[in-house]
Amino acid sequence: MLSVGLVVVCVVMAVAAGLVNRVFLKGSGFAAPVAAVRAVVQLGAVATVLVVALSRLWSSAVVLLVMFVVAAVTAGRRSEATRGSAWLAAALGCGMAAVIPLLLSTGVVPFTGVALVPVFGIVLGGTMTASAVAARRALDSLTQRAGEVEAALSLGLSERFSRMMVIERPLSDALLPNLDQARTAGLVTLPGAFVGVLLATGSAAQAGAVQVLVLISLLLAQVCGVAVVGELVARGRITRQDA
C-alpha cells in the first residue's frame, strides 16, 4: 500500500487543495498542505507509540487521557469563546460517559487497549467536532441576536431561558453532519470503520455490525455533548466578549 505512487498522489492532492483554497476561496494557499504534512507527522508518531502502548492496558489509558486533553483544548479553540472554553471538557466527558461504560459493561467492546483506543478515538473525535461547532454557532447566534435576548429579559424571562431560545437552532444544526452520515450510510457513504473491517476480515456482516455500533455510539455521545454545551452557554459558563 505504501509506495511512491501513494506519496505522489497525496502531494498532488494537498497542493491542489491549497491552490483551490487560495484562488477561488481567497484563503491561505498553505493551509491544506501544512495540515497534510502535520497529519503525516502526527499519524506516524501515533502509529509508533500505539505499537507499544496498545500492548498494555495502563499505557492505553495514558493514550486515552492524552487524546481527551487534546480534544478538549481543540474544542475550546474552535469555539472562539473568550471565557469558559475549559468547560467544553465537561461536555466531552458527558458524551463519552454516556457511551463508553455501556460498551464496556456489556462486553460489546473488549476491555483491551487494542479495542478500546480506536472506538474511544472515533467517538471522541465526533463529539469534539459537534461540541465545538455547537459552542461556536451558539455564541455567534447570541452575538447576532443580542436584541432578542435583551427583549426576553425585559419581559421578565430568566437569562437561561432567554439565551436558550436563541441558541436552540444552532445546537441542533451541530448534529446534522453525523445524522446525515447515519441516514446515508451504505447508500451514499461507506464509513471508515466499515471499510476497515471489510478489508481486514472480508466479512460484510462483521463490518456492518462494527459500523452500526460506531454510528449509534456517535449519535448518543454527540447529542449528550451538545446538550451540555447548550446548558453551559445558556447559563453563561461559556461566553464570548459582547456575546
Give the residues covered by each predicted segment:
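Short cytoplasmic-facing helical segments at TM-TM junctions of multi-pass membrane proteins
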Residues: 137-170, 174
